[in-house]
């Protein structure tokens, strides 16, 4: 599941603008229904980056010179032109996936995201990023750091979260670029698909309709123009 706005419009028989507005009103509801989530036990955590995008923004309102779609960011390494999405996955399949900040994350941003959403005394498996050290200490988590170049430390690894990132990037690629202000909705859409991936298509369709109507989105068309990237 996951078609472009144009393909969705053609299938349903509506214009592209209506397809766009319907998609994000529905995804606003799905995001509200899912919430941030909760992880517990053995947890793999990492971050994934997407190039900042102003797709759909008029040239006159652009905060920087536009870049051709798919073109590489000029700055090397992690920069403020990248959106950092924090992810955490436990062995039961529970998932947290939220846009966190622009550029490099800090332990305070991690704490802001995971406070109240991560089980006490859990085992946290991460790469060697320093921000996780202070975060794990403050939250009283047993921290297993997987050193660069290694795949695991005993039974602890981050292979599941790395695989999730690979699938996420492949899935995002089908949309031909997503504006950063909507990336939160796409992360929650991906999360929904993952949580219900073993269900039959008929059950998925029923769940999607029901769950998108459990909550109400007060989003108006004019609000889309004013929306900014939503960070935790």
Task: Give the positions of each predicted feature.
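Residue-level recognition of single "structural anchor" positions
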Residues: 1-232
């Amino acid at each position: 599941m996951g078609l472009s706005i144009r393909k969705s419009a053609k299938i349903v028989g509506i214009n592209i603008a209506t397809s766009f507005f319907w998609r994000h009103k529905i995804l606003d509801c799905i995001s509200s229904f899912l919430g941030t989530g909760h992880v517990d036990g053995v947890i793999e955590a990492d971050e994934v980056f997407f190039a900042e995008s102003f797709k759909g923004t008029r040239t006159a309102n652009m905060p920087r010179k536009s870049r051709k779609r798919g073109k590489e960011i000029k700055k090397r390494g992690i920069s403020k032109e990248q959106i950092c999405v924090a992810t955490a996955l436990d062995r039961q399949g529970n998932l947290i996936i939220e846009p966190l900040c622009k550029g490099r994350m800090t332990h305070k941003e991690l704490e802001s995201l995971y406070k109240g959403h991560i089980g006490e005394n859990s085992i946290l498996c991460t790469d060697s990023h320093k921000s996780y050290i202070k975060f794990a200490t403050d939250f009283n988590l047993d921290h297993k750091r997987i050193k660069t170049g290694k795949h695991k430390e005993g039974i602890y690894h981050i292979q599941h979260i790395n695989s999730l990132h690979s699938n996420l990037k492949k899935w995002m690629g089908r949309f031909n670029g997503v504006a950063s202000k909507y990336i939160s909705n796409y992360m929650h859409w991906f999360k929904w698909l993952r949580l219900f991936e073993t269900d039959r298509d008929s059950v998925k369709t029923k769940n999607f309709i029901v769950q998108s109507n459990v909550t109400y989105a007060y989003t108006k068309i004019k609000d889309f123009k004013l929306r900014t990237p939503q960070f935790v």
